[in-house]
UniProtKB/Swiss-Prot annotation:
SUPFAM superfamilies, alphabetized: 4'-phosphopantetheinyl transferase
Listed Gene3D superfamilies: 4'-phosphopantetheinyl transferase domain
GO cellular component terms given for this protein: cytoplasm
EC number assigned by the record: 2.7.8.7
Keywords carried by this UniProt record: Cytoplasm, Fatty acid biosynthesis, Fatty acid metabolism, Lipid biosynthesis, Lipid metabolism, Magnesium, Metal-binding, Transferase
Lineage: Bacteria, Bacillati, Bacillota, Clostridia, Thermoanaerobacterales
Record's protein name: Holo-[acyl-carrier-protein] synthase
Amino acid sequence: MILGIGVDLVSVKRIRSASERTGGRLLVRLFTPAERDCCRARRAAYECYAARFAAKEAVFKALGTGFSGCCWHDVEITNGPGGGPVVALTGSAARVAARRGITGVLLSLSHEGDQAVAFAIAVGPSESQRK
């Protein structure tokens, strides 16, 4: 059952300039080591960072919290065996998900030119399945 949805659109140029302005500290604050390793390994690293930032924002929206009370590292976006995005929730994001009955988050990412977009769907058992 769908328990929440979220979408976010991010400018690749904005992520690149913010990273350059902070000497890369922004990337450390926003992304886990696994996320940074994944993006650095790509030819289009900033498109990867922008898509993952959009994904984190979309996941927070799907959880129903916005960014409130969560840490950027509480949502980790990696790639599954087939290459598709996988969401891992930890810390306060995992607690919010458990409280709301969310057992997983489906995620779609895309980027074109200067834009990256993410769409997240929080899923869990229906009320009748939870009883």
